[in-house]
Amino acid sequence: MRRHRAYLTGLDAVLGDGDHGDNMAIGFRAVSEVIEDLPPDATPGVVIRAAGHRLVAAVGGASGPLYGTAFIAAGHVAGDARMVGVETLASMLDSAATALARRGRCAVGDKTILDALRPAADAFAAAATKGSPLQGCVAVAVTAARDGMLGTRPLIARRGLALRMGTRSIGHLDPGAVSCYLL
């Protein structure tokens, strides 16, 4: 996220309050620190939940609670398993998208993070159902996230600070959808 800090901040300066890049960089630096403090044998669920709690605590604005909630939900699905398979990863992504939508009271088409996350989760799950290997599931999820992110450009924002802009939000990518794609 540090590499994309200026880009995300520039996007958010148009639609929001111009802090999304800073918040994401701060948040994921804090996530790195909390992960370093975990025991080496921490399960994926523990790591992901810890990351989510740190995002909620460290990141201002809406993105910290939204991303944090998504990570925490995904971590709960992972549970205490030492390894997670493709099917569990699909459930984790679905749970993350559902929790984020509930927390943000948003839907696909509202010009939010969810416009990238939900299509990615659905594409990953569809590929997993067809028996695709992890790499194939990730590839279709990344493509779906990219398409969802790019699809925010013609939308009118219906959530967040960009809501104030009304039709002036058309023609701009949603910073949250962009950061979701980058993740």
Where are these regions (language model features)?
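N-terminal loops that bind phosphate or other acidic moieties
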Residues: M1-L183
